[in-house]
Every structure is written in C-alpha cells, then in structure tokens.
Amino acid sequence: MRLPVSFPLTVLSLLGSTIAHPYGETEAVLRSEPKSNQAKADAVKEAFQHAWNGYMKYAFPHDELTPVSNGHADSRNGWGASAVDALSTAVIMGKADVVNAILEHVADIDFSKTSDTVSLFETTIRYLAGMLSGYDLLQGPAKNLVDNQDLIDGLLDQSRNLADVLKFAFDTPSGVPYNNINITSHGNDGATTNGLAVTGTLVLEWTRLSDLTGDEEYAKLSQKAESYLLKPQPSSSEPFPGLVGSSININDGQFADSRVSWNGGDDSFYEYLIKMYVYDPKRFETYKDRWVLAAESTIKHLKSHPKSRPDLTFLSSYSNRNYDLSSQHLTCFDGGSFLLGGTVLDRQDFIDFGLELVDGCEATYNSTLTKIGPDSWGWDPKKVPSDQKEFYEKAGFYISSGSYVLRPEVIESFYYAHRVTGKEIYRDWVWNAFVAINSTCRTDSGFAAVSDVNKANGGSKYDNQESFLFAEVMKYSYLAHSEDAAWQVQKGGKNTFVYNTEAHPISVARN
C-alpha cells in the first residue's frame, strides 16, 4: 500500500505526550457505551469532522495538519492532499458542505506547479484516485449530494490534467516508470529500478481514467508496466508460483531480485491483481489467475505460526532460501485481500485463511497497552529482545517498531471480514480499534501519530497527521457501522465499486 515509515522524519517532530484529549461529541458518545451501529457511525462522523475542522482552521490548503503544533506541512507537493484524500469519505458520510469545499479547492489546483519531487505512486493513489472516486460517487449513488455539475465534471478534467503531467514518467526503454520525478524539468532521480508495489499499483486508477475519458493512452501506459510483473523474467525471480521479486529494472523490465513478501513495498501489487478482476473480469482474468497462484503459494510457503502462540498466523518473507519471521502493520491488508478473493471466486479456503490472518492482526492490537497494533513486529524465537521475553511468550510476537502513524490496514481487514462473513465480532473489532485510536491519538485539532503503542498514552506524539486518516481510517470505521449501500463491499460477484489502496471506491467497469 505504501512504503514503511522510519522515524525520525523531517516532516515529523517528536513532542511530549502530555497533551490533554479534548472531550467533544465523540468522547461523550464513547463514554456512554453506544449500543447501536448508528450511534457508532455518528461517533466516527464526529471524529472525521473534528479532524476536518482542525485541518481547515490551521492547514488548508496545504497537504497536512500538524496536529500538535497546529500548523501545516506539505509532504505531497502542496496540492492539498488531505482535502483530496478526504473527498470520497465526505461523500459517503453525506457531508455536503465538506464535499463542496473540496470540489472548489480541486478546481483551483495547478498540478503543473510544485517545487518538490513528485511520487508517481503516492500521487496516483491519493490525488488521482481521490478525484476519480469522487467523480464516480457523485455521478452515481451520491448524485443528489451536490448541485453544481461543473464542479463534479471538474474532477474528471483535473484527473486528466494530473495524468498528463505525470505520464512522462513512463517514457523509459521498457515502459516501467520512474517513481520519483521532476515535473518541471521532466527529470527523475536517476533510479535504475522501481519497486513491485510502486509499479504494480497504478493500473486501476490509470485504467479507470481511460474508461471514463475514452482515451486509451493512460490504460496502455499502466498496463504495459504491469505486463512485466505478470510475466516475470528471469524465471528465478518467481521462487514460488505467483510470488515475485521486489525490484524491477527500469531499462528492460527484468526483475532485479527474488525477495518475496506481502510487506510494504510489495503489498499492493498483490492487492491490485484481484481488484482488477473485480473491476472488469472480462479484461483482467489473467490478473485473477496470477493472484490465485500467489494466494495458493502464500498459504503453502509463507504461512507462519509463532512458537509461543501457534494459534496465530502471520506471513513471513522469503529470500535466498531463508525465511524472515517479521511483519508490518502495512501487511495486515492481507486478510482483506484473501477475503475479497475468496468471496468473489467462491473459494472458502481463501476466506478461511483470510480470517486466520485477520485474527493474527487483531492479536497485535489486543496485546498492547493502548490496544493499537505496532508498526512492525517479529516472532523469530532467536531474536526476541531480552526485555520482551515475557511479552513474546504471552502475545506471540515482539515489537520491532512500536509507533503508530494512523495506519488503516487492520481496520480495513476487519471491515472485509464483517462484510464477507456477516459476523458481528469483526464489526466489534473495528469499533475497538477506533475507540483506541480516538483515545490515544486525538489532539485538540486532529489526530497525531504516536511513538509507542505499548506505553501509556502511546508514548510521545509525532506532529503529523497523514492524509490517509481521512481517506482510510475514518472511512472503514464508518462503513463498518453504516447502512448497506452501493459503495459497500459485497459478497460474491455483486460489487459495484472496488476500493483502491487508499480506500477510494472506484466504480467497476460496465460492459
């Protein structure tokens, strides 16, 4: 879904943890132990509004709020990432005033201007997908939310403008794009390779743009890059059927290694294989076939159970005939991927394994002091830190990085588990995670990343609020408790929307 975060970052400053949690409507609702799903959905909506109000007051039109110092940051080129990332969530929540404010902002963005390096991947999954999703929703099931059709049409116009700014990244000998580009000089960072997820997480958004505009160029560019991932060369780069290496040579499309994982940097390549089939099963059956191979190989070769907790299931990584017994919060989308694939393909074995993965990721949440899972962990009995031996014996893992940067993947998979099985326990887990995040990360203007989920109050607060708080954490928390709708994930082959890796619902192709 996105690359792992290492601390400290230049955009984050470590601050004390003695910030009082403001008691707004959400806090009152939480203290009253809401019983109904509607009350819980309303609590999530209030939390979204709390963060939105803080962003508008202190940071708009910049990319992010700094939720401790009440300032702003521009880690995504200064085009207002939080606003664009919030659009689809605001539509789903029916917040017309927020939606209109974002639409007016989008109309004014000049995507040809930035002084910073542009990430093709991040810009695609946040900005391009955010606008395409808003367009699909407002042209479809939410068509009565906004009156100004010109503003809605502007979403598609700006999507095309942005893609036209970015498309030179694909101008390489192979068609495998550069990720880090300079849109002013049409230069790049000189990289010789691109990552698996970065290369393989463009095809949904760029194909959708072609389908909406009738211009095949965008789909062809992204599908050309993807073609090298579907037919990996050399053969050694595919150590198990469907599971491929992590780096691709930009010059010739050949894989540069054979390191296999579902962790950050590799993750969303596998995520999009099955999602492209959901988007259009006629055009993308090959993608589905590759996902099935990868899923079957993952169960056979990467499934791992901690010795101290054999009831838990995590995914290991594989390289040079060695297994790495470690995982990440980013990886926890995996349960949702298996559940989606299982229900779409009517494969109960995939559903069952997806639920095993969901259980494992839930254990990383319920084992910590804050009831939020860490950014990374391991279960190699030979590498247990001396000060975590007791924790490892009880929890089944040891914490490698205890930070929490407002990531959504665990809640995301809880949501898929509830939608596919209908079991209330998974919706309860969404609520538990939301309550923990609201309690631990909330500030007077928004929500902050924290340094250690296994310390009181999450340790120290980082002065950063990623845009995906709006796009993903709030959306999945809300969807789990809201009424059925066209944009909800459905059992079987009934999905009319498919979610990109930033949780933006894209309308499936209509043949």
Swiss-Prot record:
Indicate where this protein resides in the cell. Answer: Secreted
Enzyme class, top EC level, equals hydrolase
Q: List the disulfide bonds.
A: 332-361
- Sugar-bearing residues? 182, 366, 438
- What is the top-level taxon of the source organism? Eukaryota
Q: Name one GO cellular component term.
A: membrane
Pfam families in the record, alphabetically?
A: Glyco_hydro_47
Q: Which InterPro entries match?
A: 6hp_glycosidase-like_sf (IPR012341), Glyco_hydro_47 (IPR001382), Glycosyl_Hydrolase_47 (IPR050749), Seven-hairpin_glycosidases (IPR036026)
Q: What does its pH dependence look like?
A: Optimum pH is 5.0.
Q: Part of which pathway? A: Protein modification; protein glycosylation
Q: Which EC number(s) does UniProt give?
A: 3.2.1.113
Reaction(s) catalysed by this chain, per the record, are: N(4)-(alpha-D-Man-(1->2)-alpha-D-Man-(1->2)-alpha-D-Man-(1->3)-[alpha-D-Man-(1->2)-alpha-D-Man-(1->3)-[alpha-D-Man-(1->2)-alpha-D-Man-(1->6)]-alpha-D-Man-(1->6)]-beta-D-Man-(1->4)-beta-D-GlcNAc-(1->4)-beta-D-GlcNAc)-L-asparaginyl-[protein] (N-glucan mannose isomer 9A1,2,3B1,2,3) + 4 H2O = N(4)-(alpha-D-Man-(1->3)-[alpha-D-Man-(1->3)-[alpha-D-Man-(1->6)]-alpha-D-Man-(1->6)]-beta-D-Man-(1->4)-beta-D-GlcNAc-(1->4)-beta-D-GlcNAc)-L-asparaginyl-[protein] (N-glucan mannose isomer 5A1,2) + 4 beta-D-mannose; N(4)-(alpha-D-Man-(1->2)-alpha-D-Man-(1->2)-alpha-D-Man-(1->3)-[alpha-D-Man-(1->3)-[alpha-D-Man-(1->2)-alpha-D-Man-(1->6)]-alpha-D-Man-(1->6)]-beta-D-Man-(1->4)-beta-D-GlcNAc-(1->4)-beta-D-GlcNAc)-L-asparaginyl-[protein] (N-glucan mannose isomer 8A1,2,3B1,3) + 3 H2O = N(4)-(alpha-D-Man-(1->3)-[alpha-D-Man-(1->3)-[alpha-D-Man-(1->6)]-alpha-D-Man-(1->6)]-beta-D-Man-(1->4)-beta-D-GlcNAc-(1->4)-beta-D-GlcNAc)-L-asparaginyl-[protein] (N-glucan mannose isomer 5A1,2) + 3 beta-D-mannose
Q: What else is known?
A: The enzyme is inactivated by reaction of carbodiimide reagents with Asp-375. Since the antibiotic 1-deoxymannojirimycin (DMM) acts as a competitive inhibitor, and it blocks the reaction with carbodiimides, Asp-375 is established as an active site. High activity in presence of EDTA.
> Its family?
Belongs to the glycosyl hydrolase 47 family.
Q: How does it assemble?
A: Homodimer.
| The name this protein goes by in its record | Mannosyl-oligosaccharide alpha-1,2-mannosidase
Q: What is the lineage of its organism?
A: Eukaryota, Fungi, Dikarya, Ascomycota, Pezizomycotina
